[in-house]
Amino acid sequence: MRHRAFAVLVAGSVLAGLFLARPALGQYREYYILGKVVDPQKQPLEGVEITLRDEATSRGYSMKTKKDGTFKFAGLPHGVYKVAFKKDGFAVKEDEWKFTEPQLNIQKVEIPPVVLASEELIQQTNRLKEAEAAVKGAAEKIRQGDFDGALAGLKGVLDKNPKDPNALYLSGVAHLKKGQPAEAAPEFLKVTELSPKFAPAHYQLGVCQEQMKEPDKALESYAKAMELDPGNPDSPYNAGLILFGMNRVDDALPLFEKSLALRPDDPAAQEMAGRCYIHQANFAKAVEYLEKAKAGYAKDAEKVKFLDDLIAKLKEQIKK
């Protein structure tokens, strides 16, 4: 009997041990989760539905954010969770939370701020990405000389957003490259209105106006381009050409010299500066510039011959 009593006692002790150990082995209220949901401007979002699904057991949990955007959940078991944040008018955001270590005591975990973007913002961002890709593709087509292909790609962008300055600028460039200044000018003009400090648009507008026989407007555009980008030698050179053509030689000469200060080896600017000095009867200075221009035109036999003849005549004038 003692033996049986001992066996029962032992069995009872084992069962008691199992029952005593069970809470520790079955601990499941292990994590205290808290965090906050905000919009891209960091304003709190109320009423965001947060759902969690344990990947191993498929158990689900849910909660909602309060007025201040905060959420909390006490007693989350350990596991790997698929998490979804949902609110009307906002794009669904998904995440994965990994709480794989069992905890004997509740572990507090602060989730970094969760940002929900509105569906409108997501759509706008996607449109911007599409436009950026189209503009990049159009720029490459322009470099390849496929101006019609560039215009076709840009049309879709401008149909959706007629005020896209990048698309407008490239469309203007493509039209100008096709010899269509009348089509290009309004596009460059609109770019100058949308992005007033973008010097290339003012310069290209000046080119269009010059080709359209609007010298006064072209001079204004080149002047603005020089103000915004004083390091571009083409703006003063083009303005100088217009003034020279208007017989305003004294006004043109400083612009050619300004262009040469930025690009000293430009034979075209050297030639025009020389011509200005001819008009001023400063033949020695004219010869100096024309000799430099001739060296720059070394591969153009016809131009070299023309300058040689001109220089010879000027030297004869100097001797008189």
Predicted segments, located by residue:
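Alpha-helical segment of the N-proximal tetratricopeptide repeat
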Residues: 127-166, 170-183
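Structural motif
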Residues: 34-45, 142-143
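A short, solvent-exposed beta-strand micro-motif common in secreted/extracellular proteins
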Residues: 69, 79-89
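Short, acidic Ser/Thr/Gly-rich low-complexity loop/linker segments typical of extracellular
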Residues: 55-70
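Canonical tetratricopeptide repeat
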Residues: 170, 204, 238, 272, ...
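Structured interaction patches on ligand/partner-binding surfaces of diverse proteins
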Residues: 88-111
